[in-house]
Regions:
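Surface-exposed helix-capping loop/turn segments at secondary-structure junctions
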Residues: 16-26, 78-84, 233-239, 260-264
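Active-site beta-strand/loop architecture of penicillin-binding DD-peptidases
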Residues: 178-220, 360-361
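Long, intrinsically disordered, low-complexity segments
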Residues: 2, 6-8, 91-144, 211, ...
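Intrinsically disordered or highly flexible coil/loop and linker segments, enriched in small
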Residues: 167-171, 261, 284-288
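Extended, hydrophobic/aromatic-rich amphipathic alpha-helical segments that build helical scaffolds
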Residues: 1-18, 30-55, 63-75, 103, ...
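Flexible glycine/proline-enriched surface loops and loop-helix/loop-strand junctions
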Residues: 22-29, 52-54, 205-211
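An aromatic- and glycine-enriched ligand-binding surface/loop that stacks and positions planar moieties
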Residues: 4, 8, 12-15, 33-186, ...
């Protein structure tokens, strides 16, 4: 609590002296510098983590109220809006200039990410990050399931985030099946039957060393809506607004209803059911943005989820159709003591007994 209070006090002391917004014209080189919005986004994330079960074992509701208030403080600035293209939000110069981006780190033109993550059947591709079937199967169906295409009629964010078999990518049809160009049995191919799409520019000619600008999101509006939804639900339930502009349910449905995604609104009534909806929505909306591992830890769900086998699929082409077999790629282990890793003994010795080792180590 002492550390959290210090962080929050530093943010509160400086937030009003920070510029509200640099605007979206970055010709004068001001992009990436801290704004009031960025400071409040950090405050929102810190207080959400502090309210979560790992750090709040007694479930002190006042910590959830503080997290909700912090998210609302940022939302009340009315400076940001959800981007109308989830796919393009993460590409090139758009990331830094998007109306959704609160803080981004910009890079010069590069193709490192494409070179490391393009499918093995693309010249210069090396597979790299290979999404799991655990994640793919979590994307909801938006329409009626198609028995001939397990990826059809899903949450559109699946297609914006992950390359699946028989989809269009790199100017061709993906062949992630036995005997195909992106065959999972090929050297350096994906072990899961999937490739990463999010953040990657399509159709860069790696042979000619073609490059694009890239920016990395640190904070964006969708995260703040989801922070707000989670904290409001825990503090007041899914349908109360506590005098703020939004209920928890309204906040999460703004994210689900964003242009190009337009998933059905959540109508769940109970706090417990809504809690699971928030966890799901963070998994999907924020996929590969370095939230999932820390979310599982702060929720104390890691000992369940991260002990499940990591799975993939093996596809077989049968004429114009495909059959898919789920396979175990590797076993995973997460024990209770791994919620907090060991403090080096040298640091404990320096403290003259003040610092204690974390449990289990």
């Amino acid at each position: 609590d002492e550390v959290v209070n210090y962080i929050v006090s530093e943010i509160d002391a400086s937030k009003d002296s920070l510029i509200t917004n640099w605007g979206r014209d970055f010709d004068i080189g001001l992009d990436g510098r801290i704004t009031k919005g960025a400071a409040l986004a950090l405050k929102s994330r810190v207080l959400l983590y502090a309210a979560s079960p790992l750090y709040n074992p007694t479930n002190d509701v006042n910590k959830w109220k503080a997290a909700a208030e912090a998210a609302n403080e940022l939302l009340s600035l009315n400076l940001y809006s959800l981007d109308n293209s989830y796919r393009d939000l993460f590409l090139g110069d758009r990331t830094a200039k998007s109306s959704e981006t609160i803080l981004a780190i910009r890079q010069s033109a590069t193709n490192d990410l494409e070179r490391k993550n393009y499918p093995i059947g693309t010249a210069g591709g090396n597979s790299g990050i290979t999404p799991s079937h655990n994640l793919v199967s979590a994307y909801e169906y938006k329409g009626t399931p198609d028995p001939n295409d397990i990826y059809a009629n899903r949450d559109p964010r699946l297609g914006y985030t992950i390359v699946t078999n028989n989809s269009q990518w790199n100017g061709r049809t993906m062949e992630i099946y036995a005997g195909g160009a992106d065959n999972y049995n090929a050297k350096n191919a994906s072990r899961t039957g999937y490739y990463l799409k999010k953040f990657l520019n399509d159709n860069l000619d790696l042979v000619q060393d073609e490059k694009r600008l890239r920016s990395w999101v640190v904070f964006r509006l969708a995260e703040i809506y989801l922070n707000y939804a989670e904290a409001m639900n825990e503090a007041y339930g899914p349908d109360a607004n506590n005098g703020y502009a939004l209920t928890a349910k309204e906040a999460i449905n703004l994210v689900r209803g964003r242009t190009g995604v337009e998933m059905p609104a959540i109508t769940t009534a109970s706090k417990e059911e809504f809690r699971e909806k928030v966890k799901h929505e963070r998994r999907i909306e924020l996929a590969f943005e370095e939230h999932r591992y820390w979310d599982l830890r702060r929720w104390k769900d890691a000992t369940t989820v991260l002990n499940e086998p990591l799975t993939g699929v093996q596809a077989t082409k049968n004429g114009n159709h495909f059959s898919y077999q789920v396979k175990e790629v590797e076993k995973r282990t997460f024990t209770e003591k791994m919620y907090f890793y060991p403090i080096p003994h040298s640091e404990i010795n320096k403290s003259n007994g003040i610092v204690k080792q974390n449990p289990g180590w």
